[in-house]
């Protein structure tokens, strides 16, 4: 007779202890999952999982994984949480610091006598006094000292000492305390002159954060749970309507379209019409990007190996770009969308900045390095509204660099079912550079100037996809509103859709429905338009603002945001000329 083992119940303090030991602990449907031994095998990359440490990742895990994968989650179960609902911890990669005994900690404090448990500090919203908040944010007297061993453990799960969260650890943001969490120093009311240029930046950024707090549903866990429940109902509706079922004939047409563009390019090359040949080559790459995107999200056959092989053939072998690099980058982007410190899709210094936080030498947790706001950045950012389109013309060359770095440095999974992709991609990228740069450009086209023009025209033609990618996020919120904000709230808040007629869908390749895509990343591209009415209704019911603009108007909004950030840069640089303190 089988004896059923009693459930292992983990208290909040016990889970904190595990994280303090460097364990990759994620909450899924009230189950405690320990992903530590498996993290290097994660096909989506280790960074994506690190951003879920200490959090209830149920919605994210369902959105990004098929049913077959979901069924494997319980293999990593080590117990269940105490209580009916989990309230998120700040992941160490985002600045969360924890010490043994269920305490939050400090890197500097030597006095361990003033420890406070996380339970006692959790959910201090309107009742939290100014002095209490200052204790959390500006002093070490409330914090527990962390040993060198614990720091080493943290580094194993993405922790970097220089990363500081905007919202204090375990602080719940609300309309009543937003003036404390996001303070704005007013010269007139405070009767003081702002001398520190960083205060100018913080005022600007905090004002935007306050506007977000006022426009969104309340960020307390009860309100966000209502939103999550509605989102799960929406997800079930999407499933019930069969929108996850992909019509493979759609992709037969896509491949035929790309093949036709490629053949046109070769035909024009044959008759020495180099300009037209280059344009059609760029158009083929442009359309191929959309298929690679769909395949990377396992949104075609929903079979991991088949979709990835298909995607790598299109991205690497035909387009010269690493699908593995894109997946590692893109998965983080989806989970921590538009965060200047964590989202690589808005980390484009020295060329672009969409948040003033990037003026402060932030440490990128994705690139594992400081993004310096150096003299070159200081020269370009005030001009970014003028340089936006010209710089995007050269975007594909940067993707070559990132692709080769990813493959040669082995930044993708080195274990598990995705480990062999690295070698397939290496040969794919090599093959692309052989057939395009050597056979087609060097061996077929005569004259150095003609070769140069061909390469430039073909690559500049793909500029449109870079416009489409940045259009979705560059003008949207970059605020950090704390760990209580739900997955659907963050995705809708940070993403813009593009209104276009159905006959023009082929040109946008699904990127016109980015808000819908961010809510349901595996949804086949050709079904996104069918899902739009359901998403609009959902946003109306829960009080989220669904942002959608025409392509022209959306571009105007992006340019306006770039101009505004550029203006703030000029103000900041002017203020630094009269400031003698340490900015960083």
UniProtKB/Swiss-Prot annotation:
InterPro entries: Cyt_B5-like_heme/steroid-bd, Cyt_B5-like_heme/steroid_sf, FA_desaturase_dom, Fatty_acid_desaturase. GO terms for molecular function: metal ion binding; oxidoreductase activity, acting on paired donors, with incorporation or reduction of molecular oxygen; oxidoreductase activity, acting on paired donors, with oxidation of a pair of donors resulting in the reduction of molecular oxygen to two molecules of water. One of its GO terms (cellular component) is membrane. Heme binds at residues 42, 65. Disruption phenotype: Has a decreased hyphal growth rate and is highly sensitive to SDS and fluconazole. One of its GO terms (biological process) is plasma membrane organization. The keyword Metal-binding applies. A motif (Histidine box-1) lies at residues 293-297. Its EC number is 1.14.19.18. Belongs to the fatty acid desaturase type 1 family. This is Delta 8-(E)-sphingolipid desaturase. The gene is SLD1.
